[in-house]
Amino acid sequence: MVRICVFMVFLLFFAPSPVSAGFYTNSSAIPPQLLRNATGNPWNSFLNFTGCHAGKKYDGLYMLKQYFQHFGYITETNLSGNFTDDFDDILKNAVEMYQRNFQLNVTGVLDELTLKHVVIPRCGNPDVVNGTSTMHSGRKTFEVSFAGRGQRFHAVKHYSFFPGEPRWPRNRRDLTYAFDPRNALTEEVKSVFSRAFTRWEEVTPLTFTRVERFSTSDISIGFYSGEHGDGEPFDGPMRTLAHAFSPPTGHFHLDGEENWIVSGEGGDGFISVSEAVDLESVAVHEIGHLLGLGHSSVEGSIMYPTIRTGRRKVDLTTDDVEGVQYLYGANPNFNGSRSPPPSTQQRDTGDSGAPGRSDGSRSVLTNLLQYYFWIIFGLFLYLV
């Protein structure tokens, strides 16, 4: 019994802490105090570095170096925690690579346009992996010459992949996904992810089915705050919004401290509040990572790393479609246009054995009690 108590204390204090994130159908539903907190994005302080250039020293510049290191632009790991405020060659090279990736004027100077891009909320996945950027390179797929005209045309693709081009194996085309039960998500929130999966399902031979058993699903989805066990801690509202891992890992984590809009009305466009993030827009992007896509330098594409607050972007572009079809092929029923998303597909394989039962309406406390009950019960059976 003592061993069980010790184990429970360990779980309570050291296990990743899921959070009950804030979900709102529209801006008027967001409490005013949360809107005020959301506007205090610490990244906005980077705007004070406008005009900074190599050879100078600026107070607080070390924080911008930490930003660039997090997203892969600075690879010198021995400098972690020891960055200076000097605008050195390391930072200049990082700025130049960032400007190339986002198709900005490459100067190595922290001009206004560059810094305005830097402070936009974004995906937590890096743009540069092991010192190599795939965002700006593109791939020339074909070239056509016209005799007598001296003209050449070529098509360039901007989609990218994780190193090694990982993908789900051919024998796993019906992928399952589940939500961390400790988040106690409602059906309204879960339906947002269903719509997001459908957008990728329509253009590939893959299918996505919601199940209840979180521990055995191909894709696991959860909302967390701060450090949550994967070495990629979240950093508060309006900075890194979410991250997802390459196949076949299947982990999809979202920042539980954001104000999430779940209305899901219409296609691309703007939502009515600038201090909130459209959940479906972020979900569609992160599912692209789950399938093996990296970031794209095409600003209108789903796989572009940033999304402006108040923006809704959910429609796959040609770049997104061609990238995922390179990995998996096309859906034989796809004709180049989207149809309205079908109703949510769900196959209940939960431990409860109750067909069709959903945990979406249960409280956070109920889910936590059930979660720890099964841990204690399992340990009891093991020890006796």
From Swiss-Prot:
<keyword id="KW-0645">Protease</keyword>
<feature type="glycosylation site" description="N-linked (GlcNAc...) asparagine">
    <location>
        <position position="335"/>
    </location>
</feature>
<feature type="glycosylation site" description="N-linked (GlcNAc...) asparagine">
    <location>
        <position position="26"/>
    </location>
</feature>
<feature type="region of interest" description="Disordered">
    <location>
        <begin position="330"/>
        <end position="360"/>
    </location>
</feature>
<dbReference type="GO" id="GO:0050832">
    <property type="term" value="P:defense response to fungus"/>
</dbReference>
<comment type="function">
    <text>Matrix metalloproteinases (MMPs) or matrixins may play a role in the degradation and remodeling of the extracellular matrix (ECM) during development or in response to stresses. Active on McaPLGLDpaAR-NH(2) (QF24) and beta-casein and, to some extent, on myelin basic protein (MBP).</text>
</comment>
<dbReference type="GO" id="GO:0098552">
    <property type="term" value="C:side of membrane"/>
</dbReference>
<keyword id="KW-0472">Membrane</keyword>
<dbReference type="InterPro" id="IPR002477">
    <property type="entry name" value="Peptidoglycan-bd-like"/>
</dbReference>
<keyword id="KW-0732">Signal</keyword>
<feature type="glycosylation site" description="N-linked (GlcNAc...) asparagine">
    <location>
        <position position="105"/>
    </location>
</feature>
<feature type="binding site" description="in inhibited form">
    <location>
        <position position="123"/>
    </location>
    <ligand>
        <name>Zn(2+)</name>
    </ligand>
</feature>
<dbReference type="InterPro" id="IPR033739">
    <property type="entry name" value="M10A_MMP"/>
</dbReference>
<comment type="similarity">
    <text>Belongs to the peptidase M10A family. Matrix metalloproteinases (MMPs) subfamily.</text>
</comment>
<feature type="propeptide" description="Removed in mature form">
    <location>
        <begin position="359"/>
        <end position="384"/>
    </location>
</feature>
<dbReference type="GO" id="GO:0031012">
    <property type="term" value="C:extracellular matrix"/>
</dbReference>
<feature type="short sequence motif" description="Cysteine switch">
    <location>
        <begin position="121"/>
        <end position="128"/>
    </location>
</feature>
<feature type="glycosylation site" description="N-linked (GlcNAc...) asparagine">
    <location>
        <position position="82"/>
    </location>
</feature>
<dbReference type="InterPro" id="IPR001818">
    <property type="entry name" value="Pept_M10_metallopeptidase"/>
</dbReference>
<keyword id="KW-1003">Cell membrane</keyword>
<feature type="propeptide" description="Activation peptide">
    <location>
        <begin position="22"/>
        <end position="158"/>
    </location>
</feature>
<feature type="glycosylation site" description="N-linked (GlcNAc...) asparagine">
    <location>
        <position position="48"/>
    </location>
</feature>
<keyword id="KW-0865">Zymogen</keyword>
<feature type="glycosylation site" description="N-linked (GlcNAc...) asparagine">
    <location>
        <position position="37"/>
    </location>
</feature>
<dbReference type="InterPro" id="IPR024079">
    <property type="entry name" value="MetalloPept_cat_dom_sf"/>
</dbReference>
<feature type="glycosylation site" description="N-linked (GlcNAc...) asparagine">
    <location>
        <position position="78"/>
    </location>
</feature>
<feature type="binding site">
    <location>
        <position position="295"/>
    </location>
    <ligand>
        <name>Zn(2+)</name>
    </ligand>
</feature>
<dbReference type="Pfam" id="PF00413">
    <property type="entry name" value="Peptidase_M10"/>
</dbReference>
<dbReference type="GO" id="GO:0006508">
    <property type="term" value="P:proteolysis"/>
</dbReference>
<feature type="lipid moiety-binding region" description="GPI-anchor amidated serine">
    <location>
        <position position="358"/>
    </location>
</feature>
<keyword id="KW-0862">Zinc</keyword>
<dbReference type="InterPro" id="IPR036365">
    <property type="entry name" value="PGBD-like_sf"/>
</dbReference>
<dbReference type="InterPro" id="IPR021190">
    <property type="entry name" value="Pept_M10A"/>
</dbReference>
<keyword id="KW-0449">Lipoprotein</keyword>
<dbReference type="GO" id="GO:0005886">
    <property type="term" value="C:plasma membrane"/>
</dbReference>
<dbReference type="InterPro" id="IPR021158">
    <property type="entry name" value="Pept_M10A_Zn_BS"/>
</dbReference>
<feature type="glycosylation site" description="N-linked (GlcNAc...) asparagine">
    <location>
        <position position="130"/>
    </location>
</feature>
<feature type="binding site">
    <location>
        <position position="289"/>
    </location>
    <ligand>
        <name>Zn(2+)</name>
    </ligand>
</feature>
<feature type="binding site">
    <location>
        <position position="285"/>
    </location>
    <ligand>
        <name>Zn(2+)</name>
    </ligand>
</feature>
<dbReference type="InterPro" id="IPR006026">
    <property type="entry name" value="Peptidase_Metallo"/>
</dbReference>
<dbReference type="GO" id="GO:0004222">
    <property type="term" value="F:metalloendopeptidase activity"/>
</dbReference>
<keyword id="KW-0336">GPI-anchor</keyword>
